[in-house]
C-alpha cells in the first residue's frame, strides 16, 4: 500500500483537441486564443489517491477523451493481475425502481459494488443560428438519427414546399467535419457490442472505470474493442443513416469526417464512404521568416 504520492504539473504544450504540433516556423498565433482559456487554469472536481493497480490512461482508452496515438499509451507499464472475469456479477436485475440495491453478497469474500450510469454531454450543433441550435443527436443510435433527419428535412419541405427538396430547390446535403468531442455510450451499446465483436462486454465493463479485469492485456484488448465498436457505430448509425435518408429523398450527399486530427472517435474512411462526394478541409498558415 502506498504511503506517499506525488502530483507533478509539467509545462503545457501546443494542442487543440488532439491537433498535432505544428511544423517549425509556422505562425499559429491566429489559433492561440482557441486554447488559451483551457491552459490558463485547472479546476479539479474530484481528486482521489489509491494504491490499487489501475488501467493506465483508462479515460482515453474507454472513450471519455480522445488521444492522437493510442499505441503509445501504457508503454513500459508493468503487468498486473486484476479482478477475475468469472467473478464479475451483473446486478442490474437486483436494482429496485427507486435506485436501491436488493442483494446479499456471498459470505467469505470482499465485494466492490460498481454502479454505472450515463448522461448527456450537453454538446450543441455549431455553428448555427439560435433558432436552429439544439442538443446533438446520439450518433451511435441509427433510429434516433433517422428521426432527426426526417424532422430536419421535413421542416425544409414545410417551409419551401413538398416538391422543393430533391430534384429542385434543396438538392444536396453537406455533412460537415465532426467536432462534437468524445462520447462513449448509447442505450443499445451492449447489444451492438455483442453483434460487432462477438462476445458479451458486461463482465469487462468495470474496465471503463479503470479497474483491471483479468489482466492489463485483457483489459486493454477489451477497451480496444470498445473503441472499435464506437467507431463502427459512428460510421454506420450516423454517417450511414444520414446518407440513406438523404439519398431516398433525392439529395446528393457531400461529407467531411475527422479532418487532420481526432476530435471524436471514428474510422475516417469508413465515415466518408457513405458520401456521394467525399470532402475535406485544408488549413494554411503563414511561415515565419
Where are these regions (language model features)?
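Aromatic, loop-rich ligand-recognition surfaces of beta-strand-rich domains
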Residues: 1-73, 177
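Catalytic-domain carbohydrate-binding cleft regions of carbohydrate-active enzymes
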Residues: 66, 73, 77-289
